[in-house]
Every structure is written in C-alpha cells, then in structure tokens.
Amino acid sequence: MILPPKVIHPTGEPEFTLKKSVISALIADTFNGKIHIEWEPQAQVTTLGQLAFFIQYLKVGHRFMPWVEECPLRYTSPNAPKKINVLGSFVLSILAGYTRYAHITRIQGDCVNAPLLGMTKVVGEDSARNALKAIEENEGIAWLQKHLYQSYSPLLELPWILDADVTIKTLYGHQEGATVGYNPHKPGRPSHTYHTYMIANVRLILEVEVQAGNRSSSAYTAPGLWTLLDRIPRAHWPAFIRGDSDWGSDTVMSEAEQRGVDYLFKLKKSPLVKKLIHQYHCKSGWEKTHEGFEAFATELKLITWKTARRVVIVRRRLGKDRAQAPSNALPHQFSLVEPAEDLSAFEYSVLVTSLDAEVITIVQHYRDRADCENNFDEIKNQWGWCGFVTQKLAPCRLIARMIALVYNWWSLFVRLVEADKHYEAIVSRPLLLHGVGKQTQHAGQTTLTITSSHGRESYVKAAYMRVCAFFDELKAIAPQLTPLQCWYRILSEAMKKYLKGAVLKPPDLINYVS
C-alpha cells in the first residue's frame, strides 16, 4: 500500500472566515424623524472651502513659494517629508486656529486644500515638531524675520507708530526657559515672555522674541527694539515709540534720544511723580481733552534722569462711589484719589514724551495704545501664541514668528475683502474661511463648489467677486511687474482706507537690490 507523502510543513489550524457585516448606513432618530447616515472617506471635500481665495492671494503676491524655497530646513534621509508638505501643514493648521501640534491630525484628511498649496500630503504632528527642531535657530530666525519684514515693509512709507509690549504665556510642563516671573493671571506658575513689536492701528506684528519667564521687563525688550530699528531703513522709522510705565526709564529714553526717534511712555508713580501730582492738583490751566480727561503739560527731572523731560499729567474725575479710598487698602499704600477744592476726586497718570505735539493729541495717542491689548488678546486666544509648546526653547521662538507671519498674511487678506475695519479671527474665519467645499473634475476642469451656512453668505460672495476681479486685473499686467511690485499693488488695495486714494510706490529696484 502506497502511503501519501508526509506534509513537511503543516498547514496549521484551519482559518475560519467570519462574515463581516458591512454597515451601509447608520440610523439616527432625531426630532425631525429618522435619518440615514453614511461615511464617504474618499470624497474630495473640505471644511475650509473658501481657502482657495487666500491661496490665490499668496500666489499672486509671491508670499508662499519664496518662503518655502528659502526655508533652512535640510533633511538627509530619503524618507523625510518634503519641505513644502511640512510648511504647508503649518500654514493650514495655523489658519484653522489650531494651538497644538496634535491638532494637525484634524486636517490630514483634507485632500482639497493641500494640493492647492502645491503639497502632496499633510504631515503628521511628529514630522511637524521634528522639522522645527531640525532648523538651526539663527538661520530660522533670520529666515522668518526676512519674510515678516517683507509682509509689512511697503506700509512703513506711511507715518506709523511702533507699539512695544510684553505678554505672558503660562506653561504647565518642564520646558526650557519656563521660569517663575511676573504672571498676573497665574501667579507662581512658570511662563515664557513674548516681547512683541507692532504697527499700531493696523494691528500687524513687526517682530516677536520668546524669552524666559523672568525676563519680562523693558530691559530685555529694548535690545530687540533697537535691533529691529537697525534693520529698517532710517526713512521708514516710526513717528514715535509707545510703551507702558515699564518703558519710562532713563536708559530707554536716552537711547531713543541718541538715535533720534521720538517716544511716548507712561511713568511709574514714584515719590517725585506723586509730589508732582500734589503740586499741580489745585492749579488752574488744565486743558480739557476727550471723554472727561484733563491734562497739564510741564517738565520733570527725576533723580535717575540725566536731564529734565516734558511730562503730561492726565486726570479724570471719578464718580462719587469711587471717590474714597478703599477701606481694605494695604498699609502705606498710596491712594490715587486726591481731594480737590470742590471735594471731588480724580485719578491720575503721568506721561513722558519727546513729542512737541499739543496736549490733547498726546493724551489721545496714549489712549489709543489700548488697542495693543486687543491685538494680544486675538493672537494669543484666537491664533496659536498660547500653544505649540515643545521642550526646547528654539522651536518655540520659530513657531511664534511663523504664527505672526501667517497672522500678518491673513490680516492683510481680510483687508482686501473689508478695508474699513479689522476683523478678528473669531469673526473672519467663519465669514471668509469656513464652508463646505466639494471638488469635482470633468473634462479637464476642476470645480470647487462651496456651501456656506453663514448668515452673510451673499455679502461674502459679493466681496470675493470684487477680490477676484482685482486679481484678474493684476494678473493681466503681472508679467510686466516684479514680485515686489505685485505685493505693493496688493497692499495698496488692502490699505486704501489709510492711503485715501494714493498708491504705494515700490523703491527703485536697482537701489533696492543693492
């Protein structure tokens, strides 16, 4: 009897194929009856349906591709992600309002906007985080500073005001530079300090420096200010520098006077400043300003000052319910309420300035500085300055400038749509960015169909028709223009409220390049 051959390699246990139930749809019982819900993972749709208009703006203005090409990100591995995929992922996540690297996962399935930016895919959070670590810090800062300057430099031909201030970013881990310092929101909690320089009124970021949490005074902000001014041509310097009471030191003011730039700061209420308030409290000659404020101009020389300087005492009458000092005041605490002859009371502040403008103008200039806090509130809470944290300080410095750059790009783009006012991101994103976009292709033509649930959809459609008409006119003459001249044309349209019919003229290209 011939036996069957032995099996050298047993087949093992037989596999039992289980029938997998394919769920075609789910049923949800709603107040409007039952509905059938299906998923379509391969559909070419996006929740940022109106982003295509912003991408056109970046392309016509020559903002995105030069920024990508000049990025000092270098990989040696053949499996490393493409540079444009990394930077494009950052732009998409920042525009969407994300605040953590992990949030990039939310847009990894966006197969519509990524190709529009020239990308092949959206990278993961680890690739994005490691990319910033791979950029040499000094090279990365110089790269971002250059493109930040290019985003706003045409506007510096107009008279402008430089606001300098510091904001605190509270930290909850063990990051480099996370030290305990001045932190009014979370006392005793470690933080980083963001030393920021802004263009007043138009709310654009000139530069931002991230430092340790215990370096919040103007002594650490001023060196960056002077370095920034050194990079700006002298003819484009601000009309004056504006800062809070931390800037009213002799060191800062002497440096400003030596450089020939005017300033407007607030003074701390030192004993001599309090004495000055007592001295002029009952004097006549106070000038009425806006909204119940009064001002008196004089001179003051503090002990630490090398020379006397012009100061403006500002006061406002308090209501009767605020006229008395609080009963729970600390011992030796100075009360700002001084009794007047008519038994009313005032609150005081003292400004120091090198400007020779009228008192009313100076007071209004400093009151306008309150918009600086609105800028901080927007970019911290509606963009990403409160997030994107890493263990090392260098990536934090790079991402802070990257967020400022995308913020500038978006703010100027929104001005193209609505030139009369600044829309914060909490308003502009739902209005001009969000919307379901479905991409279809037929006969070689790609169509993006947008569905917006915003109540002002008709306004947005009309606004984008105007923007597209402007870009069509610009593209018609673009072959005759340089990238710099195209950007000047775009900013002239975006800032027409401030230009009042004028057009920004680019510099002589030969001298500009040299």
Show the residue positions of the predicted features.
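Anion-binding and metal-coordination hotspots
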Residues: 1-50, 55, 64-514
